[in-house]
Every structure is written in C-alpha cells, then in structure tokens.
Amino acid sequence: MAAPRHHHLALAVALALLVVTAAAADEGGPRGRRVLVLVDDLAVRSSHSAFFASLQGRGFDLDFRLADDPKLSLHRYGQYLYDGLVLFAPSTPRFGGSVDQNSILEFIDAGHDMILAADSSASDLIRGIATECGVDFDEDPEAMVIDHINYAATDAEGDHTLIAGDDLIQSDVILGSKKIEAPVLFRGIGHAVNPSNSLVLKVLSASPSAYSANPKSKLASPPSLTGSAISLVSVMQARNNARVLISGSLDLFSNRFLKSGVQKAGSKIRHEKAGNEQFVTETSKWVFHERGHLKAVNVKHNKVGETNEPGMYRINDDLEYSVEIYEWSGTSWKPYVADDVQVQFYMMSPYVLKTLSTDKKGVFSTSFKVPDVYGVFQFKVEYQRLGYTGLSLSKQIPVRPYRHNEYERFITSAYPYYAASFSTMGAFFIFSFVYLYHK
C-alpha cells in the first residue's frame, strides 16, 4: 500500500509545482499568452508559418482551428479560454460553435486583443467585425487597391495591385525604434477610417496616387476611396486598452511576402527583403502588449514632512503626491520616463494642475498647496499618449476649513477693524464722561 501513496503524493506535488509555475509565468507580463488562430483553410498554417513561428518564438501558445469548427468556443464556464485572437479567415460566412460577431466583439470588450486580416474575398461577417472596430472596407466586393506609380517592380506587367507601401505611422511605440527601411508589400482591399474617431490610427497608408476599384474592369465612375485616405493597415486601441489590428491583405503576413525581395517601380534601389517581416513582427508586439503597456502602482499622498497618508486635508496645507509608472519591455517592467505626466487636484474642475517630475527610476512626484476651498477633492491622473495604454488614476480626499481654534489670535489684515472698534469704545467713554459731568 505504500507505493500507491507515494505515487499520489508525487502526483500532487507535480500538480502543485505546475500551478505555481504557471502563476509565476503569468504574473510578470501584462497579458496572457493563449492565442486562438482561426483560418478558413488549414493550408494557411503552412503558407503563413513564418509569422506564426515568430509568435511562438516569443512565448505565445497558438491554438489553430478552422473557423467553422462546430466545437469552437471563446469561453467556458464564464472564463475566457484565450487572451488573444488571430482571425485569418477572410472568406468564412459564419463561425462554428458558439462564436459569432457579437461574441468576438464581447471578447474585445472584455479587454482582449485581435489581429484581423481580410482580402478581396472578405465576407460580410468579416466586414461587419471590421466596421464595429472603426474601419470600413470598400463596399465593392471586387475592389482592390491599385497604384500605377507606387507598385512593386515585379508587377510591372500586371494590374498594379501589388503595392510597395512606405507611408508608415511615425511611432516608435507601435513600429519599434528601428526604422523599417524597405517598402511593405501589400495586395488586398483598402478601408477608410473616420477622422473623428480618435481610437483608430492608420499604420500603413496608401500613396496619393492610389485608388480602390475593380482591377478587371474599366472605371465607370470615380472611385469612392482614393489617395492617402485609403488605409491599408490600421490599429485600434479601445478605451479598455484592448488592441486590434486590421489589415486588408492576408498576403501581408504570408511567407512569400515576408521573404520576398522588393523594388519600387521607378526606383533603382532593390531591397533583398521586403519590410513585411519587420512590420508584422513589430505591430504584433504592440497588439499583444509586448510594447507600449504602462502600469501605475504605489499612488501616495501626504503632508510635507510626514509619511502617513491622512484621511483629510485642511485648506492651505502643503502636500506631496507621487506615483510609480512602469513600462513593459517584452521581458520585464522598466521605469517609464516622460516629462508630460500631470496630476489634477479636482472638484468639478481642476483647482490645481501640476506636471510631475521624475527621478527616471519610475517615480513621478510633485508638491503643492491645497487651495483655499473646502469640499471633496480628487487626485486625478489622466494620461493618454499615442501607442501607450491609457492611465486613469483617481483618489478621493476631503478638504476641511480651519476649525475655530486654528485661526490666528489676531489677524493682521483685521487691524483696521480692531482700531475702529477700540476707537469707537474710547470715543463713547469720553462722550459719556463729558455729558454726565460737564456743566
């Protein structure tokens, strides 16, 4: 009977170690590593293997499923099974299992991330998901982006739908600090971004000479999408910091485009490798929060010269405020360095607005005097910067007036009133004395 006991004990210890190890692995990063990859053809797994290998090499656990799998589900027993979604199924008319457009949008609303790639065969389902994320693909189902000037030289005899794009967003947070030198190959459909929507950004835009139309037919009317208004790849960061990348080209992520050389039409410079591999690697790092993710910890406030946080301040108190902000580097949390983080001392409107100074070790701090107004105030930090997750910090604190025994015994500004009072009493005494005793 001893052997079974030892066997059960060893199994229990192994399971405990597995749980502890998994918890330790998840504790460090801002996001989990479970990613569902939906494809409409399992051949995509091999034709886009370099991109998937890049994700797996960075520690992501990919679960490949056909988009119409009848057992497909994003959650079970109220818990999501995945932390991210790669949707490489542009032609699928409906998803299998319990997955539909609403469940994917709920997945994003729950704070999860998604990469969506479409092409000229994009179904209404894929177009609908993209629309809900803030971008509108060309309504013409036969349309593709055409550029008779900025096309790849290998497409010289073709219909000029193989675009060599180099109009990239200027953001080291989204695209990395190393500049993408080579043009990015793109063949697919364009989309429009509402300029009033501050949550969506164009990452790769078409050139002014591009337009969206059916390459197999002559133009009967002016195209609805033209020039730089056409976005080839866009990203969206929701208010809950969920991130979405939408590409009008599935080929953008393919092995063929990632490993292909590129030469722009009319240019003498030939690049041995297109910018696709660097582009999709860097943008996927941003989408899955390997870069540009901030966290704030240890929010503190206290009176100057003290360390304990009071439950209430008095008007005109001198106080100190500090917060620690860190940025995820992909492997660890590093101190965030910036000179534009501000704190508000807020009641209906900001009474105090101060820029926080940093020690470049992650600590941001400032000091100020409590305004001569009592009520319920808030320390507020609202930090929104391009490419970074937003920080919204709020801490409530009441401010009271002076108590009766806390005022100065004699107020300097009241001396004229003191003099007036005593002079009035003196004059009345003299008047009374003269009136009573003078004959």
UniProtKB/Swiss-Prot annotation:
Coarse class of the protein's main subcellular location? endoplasmic reticulum
User: What does this protein's UniProt record list under function?
Assistant: Subunit of the oligosaccharyl transferase (OST) complex that catalyzes the initial transfer of a defined glycan (Glc(3)Man(9)GlcNAc(2) in eukaryotes) from the lipid carrier dolichol-pyrophosphate to an asparagine residue within an Asn-X-Ser/Thr consensus motif in nascent polypeptide chains, the first step in protein N-glycosylation. N-glycosylation occurs cotranslationally and the complex associates with the Sec61 complex at the channel-forming translocon complex that mediates protein translocation across the endoplasmic reticulum (ER). All subunits are required for a maximal enzyme activity.
Q: What's any GO biological process attached to this entry? A: protein N-linked glycosylation via asparagine
Membrane side Lumenal: residue ranges: 25-416
Q: What is this protein called?
A: Dolichyl-diphosphooligosaccharide--protein glycosyltransferase 48 kDa subunit
Its UniProt pathway annotation is: Protein modification; protein glycosylation
Endpoints of the signal sequence: 1-24
